[in-house]
């Protein structure tokens, strides 16, 4: 196992949505979902939250991430793909994941370009109007 964050493309992350040994973690804050909507099949675990017009840490990030990981314990080995709006916060979240998941059961990836690249590539999102 690797204890470094690997960079990957949105196309590779999209392919991972169909892999039972992988999970895509969307770390955008809920307010950002209105821009592009979430990725169907991704786990929505915000890295930061907007409070009083400021970005603050999501106190539940680690716990929510561990829930996704514990769901995959039976596979023994899996891949986590982190995505945000542009690829910066997802890299921070991926670093945190490496700190949390020190047992060597997963590879951690940052999706370069984030949702900006995802949308440019024509990959699917759920329109925000359908989230109601």
Task: Identify the residue ranges that each predicted region occupies.
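Rhodanese-like catalytic fold shared by cysteine-dependent sulfurtransferases
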Residues: 1-23, 30-81, 88-132
């Amino acid at each position: 196992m690797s204890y470094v964050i690997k960079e990957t493309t949105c196309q590779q992350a999209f392919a991972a949505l169909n892999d039972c040994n992988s999970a895509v973690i969307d770390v955008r804050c809920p307010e950002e979902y209105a821009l592009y909507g979430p990725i169907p099949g991704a786990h929505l675990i915000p890295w930061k939250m907007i409070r009083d017009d400021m970005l603050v840490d999501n106190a539940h990030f680690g716990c929510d991430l561990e829930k996704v990981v514990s769901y995959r314990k039976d596979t023994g080995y899996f891949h986590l793909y982190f995505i945000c709006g542009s690829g910066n916060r997802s890299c921070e979240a991926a670093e945190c994941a490496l700190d949390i998941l020190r047992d060597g059961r997963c590879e951690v990836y940052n999706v370069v370009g984030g949702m900006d690249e995802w949308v440019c590539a024509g990959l699917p999102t759920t329109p925000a109007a359908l989230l109601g």
